[in-house]
Amino acid sequence: MSETQEQEASGNGEPDLPTTIRVTLKTLDDREATVTIGLQDTIQSLIDLGRREMNIQSGFQRVIAGGRVLNSTQTVQAAGISDGQTVHLVDRGPSGENDRPNVMPDRVAGPRIINAIPGLPPPGFIFQSPAFARMIPGNVEIPTPPSQTQHTVVHPIRVPGSIAGTPVLTSRVSEDCVLQKAVPYRGTSNSPNRPQAASQTVTFPSEPNVIQWTVNIADDLIFRPREHFEQVVRETINNISFLSDSTRLGVSMKWNQNCTSLSVELPPVSPHIPSPALEKLDFLCLWTDHLSRFIDKLEEHDGLVAATRHVLEMVKTRQFDQNLSQQARNQRVEALDEIVKHLEYQWAELSHMKDFERIRFRKNQTEEYRALKIQEYPETPRNPHFYMRHALDIDVIGVMREFRKQQRRFTRLEDLLDDLNEVGAVKFIRDHITTEVDYRYQALSMFYCYIQRMRHQISHMTHLTADLDVSFITPSFPQRILPQYAFQSSDEQPLTIPVTHIFEPPRMLSDVGGRYNGDYPYLAYHPPSVHMEVVLQEPRRIAEPRPQILARPTPQQFVLTQEMNQGGSINLMAATDPISGLSLQDVLRAQQEQVENLFAQQPGIEGGRVRVTARPGRRFVATTGDAPSVPVETLPPPGSDQQPGTSRRFTTHRFNVQPDARGAETETLAPFPVAIEPNELQRIAKNIASRYRAEALQRIASSLTTRFNNESWDTRIQNMPLCTLRECVAIALEMLTSAGNTVNESKDLMLALVRDEEVLVRAIAECIKSLFGRGEFPTHVARLIMPTNQTASSRNDYESVDGVEESQSDEFDSMIVRVPSDISQPQSGDLRAIRERRQNRRQFLENRGRIPSTSSAPSTSENPPGPSFNSEDAADIRAGRLPLGTRPNRRTVRETVHPAAAARAESPNHISLTFTATTHTFAPAGFPLMMASSNVPSTSAGPPGWPIRQVVSPTPTTRGLFEFDLSGSSDQPARSTPSPPAPTPRTTSAPATVQSSPTRQESMDIDSPNVQNPGHVESPAAIAARQAARVARARIDHLAATFNGDLADSRRQSPFVTPGPTTPLNDPRRRTVRVTQHVKPMVAIDPFMNCTNRHCEINRLATPTHMADGDRFTLQSLQPDQEFEARIQALVPSIERRPIQIHHEDEDYNYSIRRTQSGLLSFRNLEDFRPFVKTAIRSLLAHCIDADTLFTMNMNNISGYQAANHTELLRMVKEHISRVPGSRATRNASQNTTSVNQSTETSPREQMNRSPVQEAADPRLAFSPFPPGINLEQEVLIPGQIASLLTYLVDYMESSSNPRPPGIFGFLLELTYGRLTRHDFAQLARRTTATNVASEFEAQIRAHIRDNYLVGRTGLSNSELHGIAENLANNEQFFAIFMSQNDQLPTSFPFGYDRNDFAEVVWAFRQIEIALIKSFLTLSQLNLDSGNAVRFILQSVDSYLYRNLIMFYRMCDRDVERMKIQMKRISDYFATIRYESTDRPGINVFIDNWNRVMDYWSNRYTDFSEENFDQFLLKVRAGTDWNDIVLNESRQLLPTIASTSSQPSTSSSSLNTVSTNNPRKRNHDGSREDNDDCVDVVAPMMTSLSTSSPLTSQSSSSGTRTSSGSSGPSTSSTTTNNIQ
């Protein structure tokens, strides 16, 4: 109230208005609390009072009053809360999304949503009509729907309006008397005026249609005058009992102008929707009632059960027939038919829900029941006004009891079914049927059918009972039921898989060990309801794992042509492919050429080592077109000697930026406007493109126009606007630099493009030629960007020397073109070398007798440089079309791109071996063994092929691939055998083509047929037949290997059934898949129900990333009993869900191999190598079988689900079967951590006081490609808040009226207050500055302790120091009060080696505090330098914090989450000491600040050893004078003093071992600080001296390891924090 108002009130003699009111807060679980609050206090203060009164820990509460959510920043008076009013305190998360349960989000990309218009209800329909756009005013904003809103996805039409033309819910009227139509809600007189904010977008249909009924009534005298008619209608409406008072008042009437019709407008009725729990309860009621009537019908007199029992007695007594007449038999059959009709009628009634709610309200007519049952939801910008009906526990309990009663009755029927199965009733009756229709057999069939049908129904009912648990936590009765939704468990522990050095041992169910002849070890589980036409398909041969060789894909089909019919006989060799034009003979020639290449690579590999390199599992496919450009392997991009192109230039993690962040001004680029620190290639490209000058863009556009200015490229872009050109350059830079395998390579590519405009123009031209001409982006972009002096886009005339008739390479599609990637390959213009190599290969084949000796006719035609197309392409270009028609593809080259290995010296005795599990085409399986040995004849046949097995999968099965990549890169010479002469350099790393491979038996029998059987000569017909079979079999392999479609697409389900494998994918005969079908869960345990229950085993195994109802969870429905759930998680064993692995003593996984530091595997001889190959094959086959099992289990349509998505299946295989190992840097870091931890095990005390891990000296690990991210909240925000809290201590101590903290807290404040300024207290929040402050003031503090606490005495004994510390520490009553305020904490806990030995909590807390005080007293007596003194101070404080943390950890049963919750009770206890009462202002802010300190403490100090803590308590209880300083001095101080006696110790050498160049200066003076020392920590419990991480000076360790016999908590972020 203002002063003027107060004077007027006093002048009038009116009493003063009250300034405080009493408000009652009520929660959803019926807890109430009455608080007193001022009218000018905020709603947030009211929430805080309610949380404190009801002991609510979470901070997501809102106040609801008058049907609306109050703003927390409003005052109580402004919110309209009066004295004595009751408001609701509810839990609501920070996100306001999806406060309505059943909302269908707008996910249509095209249409838009009209925003709220003042004066009209907020619209929500999606208008797709073009005419509607003309009706919208010009000033109305039409925003696009938000893309990040996550609503509960519910199908918009849950109940159809009609089924087969019959209305379901719509009322039917007589069209002769009543005219029915629907009009928009806008324009009606009852339309409310609800202004909406312009920025709020609605996503629900808040503008419904108005159903208008026009009743034609004959005009009569009884309706005159008109006012009498209106009065009659009004009175009739008011007397209707089923209308509410608000509805009666909202009725409006209006006559038309002629007073011939009266419009009666009823107000909209707010809908009542059931809660999820009530929906489940009603379904359970409906099915329970159905189950009761079902059992009654079966058990009625002379019913189905009686007939079944009669048949059972006949079977037991072996009575074959009864002497019944035919009429009696027919009567029994008719009686059974009547039972079937009645049961089917009962099942048909399940399609309509009964009105159980009406029955419940009749039984319970109290206001309390109605208030709990119906909950009103006010209108919001997203939701209309509606009511939600809840399920109450009193309703659930009765339904549960009735269901269990009927379930026991049904159990007796199941026992009868088991009796029939035991005696074989069906077989007995079926064998003795004498009539056409036997009533006995029909009775058994009916009983079997309906019992199984009801079993499935009961399984759903049993599942619903788990969702309707009555909570036992809240004592109120009755109470609402919240369903047990599934939730994502926060399991931060990574899954540890026991592996050997290289390969993971296979699982028992998929292990091929001990199998013979390729038996499939495990029969995959097929979910129920799999369609029989899928199961009964024709068997197909499983593809066996083979090594890949140089090959090209076999054409998909061969067609009989005119040339095949020669002389009345069929010539299979003339069969041609209609797409590529190849014949079988051409394909065989191409395969023979590759076999020659294989033989040429055979010699010189004996005695070599095997090096395992990581290869990606996917393929990159590229084509080169008609005139492929020959890329040039060149030097790295140009650069100065001081800054070479391939080395790291700066340590600022910036992309080619000088330390001053200003780029040089060049002819092409403008200077850097701001400091650029890009994190992704797209941002790099946009930043670089923003610097392009206008004249440079014009020059590039002109160059590109010139390059394309010919017949085939008539594209002029030089007239484009600058903004378009800049975007084009940005996109080109992004795509071109993405070709790099690493970040450094991408940086080099960006440098080369920026420094030379000609390089950029040439690269864009080549890529556009490949992209627009053939639809594929080239994979050799890196070699296009970095040439030496020759252009890569020149015309190359490849001549066909393999084909006799064809001399021009443009029309010869079977020629194999290789893209050279080695400097030894012919360069761009060296066409003579290309012709010589091909002529030599042709001569080699003629000498081997593989092809007839004919002369080749090389072409001498010269073609101009530039893109080349044939005559058809030129015609298309003239017509304005791109050359992308339906003509067959030109010469295609498939490249398998892998990251380039590190450069090493060539050695012919080194073998680079790559094992990959992928889906490629395969070569003969005998090929790896032939490559691994020396001097193996080329005619050696491989082992027999794998047998054909039945594959239920309608999709290709999983295959395995071994890629034996021969390369000459090694830095270690062979030791076992002398090195043979080095062979001629070959293009071993060149991209290889892909061919469909022959079978094992037919791979090399054409090479030299006389070797195996000299006297045998095969006929041409036999050779042709064998080759045709070989090609057909290779075609099947090729189709299965290259299949990359969507498994969910039914058009690809079975390519071997009608309408045939050659049917186009867009053929209308192929069945399409509905988009709205749900995706089947990956783990098919209970596949017939889509379950979202949090107890469901499907969710526990699959752990989905987002559940269907995940956005509407409340705290009660997520975790009704959080402590009990945490208790269960602590007791659950940490084991894998997958099948167990094979025994560790298996001979294939029980040996060791040699591994170098660089990751290479070294073998002494071939005897060591052969077991390794066997292990590799065994592991690979097991992985293939696991993947095949996942595919088989998830690719079939089952009831209610469609086949799983192909991409999701691949993700499952990658994540759960073939897990990608970590990077080498990560593995090395973990190995270093393990070695450091092992070194510190000799000193238990050093485990607690260990320091950060020393950085490795390996230069490859000196700079990470991606700098580690900084958690701004943990590293900046929270330490800043803690610094403000420490600064507040100065203000607190300045006021003498504030109570002084007792014990250790007052002791520390007395030492620091008066010496440390506010800035010094703020410096204590971070480690780097806290050590500086301690080193500056440690001498003064130690002198103060000697003068005031030790009375100037020195040389005190340990017992005397202990006595002084006991007097300074808090007494046991201080800790007893804290324990009395927290009843959930135990008063004692076990410790030591004997678990029957208990210690009192109060006593242990006090001993920990005494130990810290005694450490400070001891330090004041020692003559130490500043560095050692600060080190001992930090170690003592760390020990104090560790021990208190372990105390809470023990009291909370080693539950980390519960420990963090209980530690916040310290904040409440401090608040009671500080404020002495709970209603003081500012107490909530005080508690929140200290809660942040507790969270920071528990998160930082996670790596502790319980063994050291037990040792401390045992020593103290035994009477030993424990002194941390004496113990640490004996271990660390004496060696340090001895080593530094000859040279004075500096703070930089004694305080920190990671940052040796950091001078001990205050960090506010601008000195440089090392990143490794920047750990922001704080010492809780008001220590004020160190709040650092436990990682201190001497010992070196990290990670989440605890010592043996201890079980300290660990989180995923511990290693990162400790390394910092």
UniProtKB/Swiss-Prot annotation:
Family matches, as InterPro entries: Death_dom, Ubiquitin-like_dom, Ubiquitin-like_domsf
Region of interest (Disordered), residue spans: 621-648, 791-810, 842-874, 950-1016, 1219-1260, 1537-1620
Ubiquitin-like domain span: 21-96
Comp. bias intervals (Low complexity): 1537-1556, 1583-1620
Highest taxon of the lineage: Eukaryota
A molecular-function term among this protein's GO annotations: misfolded protein binding
SUPFAM superfamilies per the UniProt record, alphabetical: Ubiquitin-like
Listed Pfam families: ubiquitin
Bias (Polar residues): 852-871, 1225-1242
Segments of skewed composition (Acidic residues): 799-810
Gene3D superfamilies: Phosphatidylinositol 3-kinase Catalytic Subunit, Chain A, domain 1 (3.10.20.90)
GO terms for biological process, alphabetical: ERAD pathway; signal transduction
GO CC annotation, single: BAT3 complex
PANTHER family: LARGE PROLINE-RICH PROTEIN BAG6
Protein name per its UniProtKB record: Uncharacterized protein ZK688.5
Organism of this sequence: Caenorhabditis elegans
